[in-house]
Each structure stands twice: as structure tokens, then as C-alpha cells.
Amino acid sequence: MAIRITFTYSTHVARNLVGTRVGPGGYCFESLVRPRFFSHKRDFDRSPRNRPASMYGSIARELIGEGSQSPLVMGLISILKSTTGHESSTMNVLGVSSFKASSIIPFLQGSKWIKNPPVIDDVDKGGTVCDDDDDKESRNGGSGWVNKLLSVCSEDAKAAFTAVTVSILFRSALAEPKSIPSTSMYPTLDKGDRVMAEKVSYFFRKPEVSDIVIFKAPPILLEYPEYGYSSNDVFIKRIVASEGDWVEVRDGKLFVNDIVQEEDFVLEPMSYEMEPMFVPKGYVFVLGDNRNKSFDSHNWGPLPIENIVGRSVFRYWPPSKVSDTIYHDQAITRGPVAVS
């Protein structure tokens, strides 16, 4: 009888200790006992008033569409925004802000993604004819490591990967986002696609054939006001020949140094003819992949290398077409240059 009374009393005392929460000891006891023995889970406040404003930043607007409800990706974007804020007091010598523990909370919250990403600098303005053809799959970059990675990932993983990559580079001087307003590079890049252009590689090497480059309007277009171009206009095209090459178009095919080029990224055979043209030193020859709907070197001649501002390396929009834009099949046939 005494043992039963003692056990009952001890149980009563334990319950009082748990329920009273007097002093720090009460909190400590509860934090240790409840999770282990009662499997109690705290509910975070899901009130919209407590959602951080960083959840609705420019990166989230840029990357995610209206339909996604993923708490994982939403929390990731929130953390990235919170760590790339404008509070100079949190920046260290490497330019990376300190991590905030409170930014983990959005991982447990749900919200609607914001529609209509902000407008980014357009490339290939003006002279290229826009043609709303039926959608076809891009034949470029299919063997890239980005494509291999994303092919086995879920939609959440794709969105998260895109968010991390673009948010890191978005404010960097090493890269710049660009928007495609025409179909001159179709089927590789379609109207409405958005790419990340890196600005580093050409400090260490020359532009190469098959590179997709973003460049300022060539000088010849600025000399004639009737073209309607200014120094602020930029284009996006693919390099098909480099300095010292001879370029020619005949029978719907491109010839470089009198060797026909087998290009699997071109939409269709060319409907125009072009006499042999020499590419001088310090220049490259650029064409759009949609050869018959592109305003390029076959119209205005070789492009000065100094006008190139970057190389397209990554398409981050739309999310369903996230991929690199680097051409991986380097089996483009090039013949010797004739010297006389």
C-alpha cells in the first residue's frame, strides 16, 4: 500500500513539474522529456503576418511560376534572399552575409509563387525577324552535365538548382542575365528564353567556333542611322568561323575554308547565297541558328571580337527547359586555310 501511494505521489509531482514551467529548469525538463517520451511536435506560427518579406524578392519572381507550392524551394529562396540582403553590417570580407537561423522557418511554410518575372535586358533587338513557329525540342546541349543532372531530378530539385545558380550569379560582375526576344537562335534558344552570360572565359582564351556569344552592335550598324541601332543594343549569335577563315554559303549549306559544315543545331538549310568572305584578324563570323530569320554576319560582315561582352552558358528560364547552352559536339569539320 505504501509503495502504491509513493508511486502515485511521485507521478503527481512529475506532472506538476512538467506543467508549471517555473524558471529555466522547467523549460529544460520539458524540452528533454516531451520530445522523447510524448513525441510532441511544436507547430510554427503559420500566420502570413510573420512571413519574411525576402520571400517575395526578385529572384523568386524571376525563377518560379504561379503554380508551384513547394515549401522546400520556397524556403531555399527565402534563405538565399536573407543572406544576400543589403545590410552592410552583416557582410564579411568575402562579400557573403552571415546565415540567419530564422530563415529556416520558411521551409515549413507554404505560399503561392509570384507570377510575371521582371524584365531583363533583351538581346538581339531590332533587325531580327520574329516568327512564332510551332515549338520544337532544342537539339543543343543534350549531353551537357547540367542536362544529365537535371534529367534525374524532380521539379523541386530543378527549381532549387536554378535558384541557387542564378541567385549566386545575379548580382555578380562575372555574369549577367539576358532575355531572348526573337527566334533568330531557334531551335537552340526560343523567344522568351532567358540565359546567363558569363564574362570571364574570354580573358583567358579567344572566342571559339560554336560558342554562343552576346555582343554589342557592330560599328558598321552604328554608322548608318537608317538601321536604327545604338551602342546600347546587343545581339546573340553563334560563332561559325574565326580569324583567318574563309566563309561561303552555297546550295543551302555553310562552307568554311571550302569544307561543308555539318551542324545539327541549325533549323533548316539556308535559302540565300553568299560569296566567299575572309575573316580578318581580331574578328569572328557569327550566324543565328535560325539562318533564314537572323540578321547577322551574312548581312553586315565579320564581328570585331572586342564587341563581344559574354558567352551564353546556361538557360535558366523557363524552368522546364533549364539546361546549359554550350555545344558539346566539337566534330565540326574545318579545312586548312588557303595561303597565296
Curated annotation (Swiss-Prot):
Residues 176-340 are lumenal, thylakoid. Its EC number is 3.4.21.89. It is a single-pass membrane protein. Residues 1-52 form a transit peptide. It catalyses: Cleavage of hydrophobic, N-terminal signal or leader sequences from secreted and periplasmic proteins. Gene3D superfamilies: Umud Fragment, subunit A (2.10.109.10). One of its GO terms (molecular function) is serine-type endopeptidase activity. The active site is at 184. Pfam families: Peptidase_S26. SUPFAM superfamilies: LexA/Signal peptidase. One of its GO terms (biological process) is signal peptide processing. Belongs to the peptidase S26 family. Cleaves the thylakoid-transfer domain from a chloroplast protein. This is Thylakoidal processing peptidase 1, chloroplastic. It comes from Arabidopsis thaliana. The lineage of its organism: Eukaryota, Viridiplantae, Streptophyta, Embryophyta, Tracheophyta.
